[in-house]
Amino acid sequence: MRLGPILAAATLATLLAACNRSQPATPTGSEPKAAAAAPSDAEKQAMLASLPAPYNTADLANGEAKFALCQSCHTVAEGGANMTGPNLHGVFGRKAASLPNFKYSDALTAAGWIWEPQHLDHWIEKPQTFLPGNKMTFAGLNDPKDRTDLIAYLMVSTGYKPQ
């Protein structure tokens, strides 16, 4: 008798049974937020048009492409995880180093500014030059148009609300 097919069937049955097990209940007060539906392209374009100049004429596709340089350390979705860097949802209008569940550098904690597009522009140009002692290892984005596009993408993707 051949054991190969029997072992394969037993393994498959075990995997299927494991997938069907109920998950432990989420502790009260820590229910994950339901993910908001991603805006349509038309909604993104409307949000873009409502941004202050020069961001209202930015190239969102290029901004999203430039964010690929950031996404190994940052997320943008509401309720998204902190990674090596903090989640960026709601970053505009927020005091620097103010997320309670992320350990910022002493330099950024002492900075005391509010994140606005102009601060972010200087920050992503050369983070270590703009604020020596911060923990961000990104070398920077030299092209001003790329920075404008990236900032516009972040404004559209992170819940920007004009101040």
What residue spans do the PLM features occupy?
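Sec-dependent bacterial lipoprotein signal peptides
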Residues: 1-17
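C-terminal capping alpha-helices of c-type cytochrome domains
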Residues: 116-163
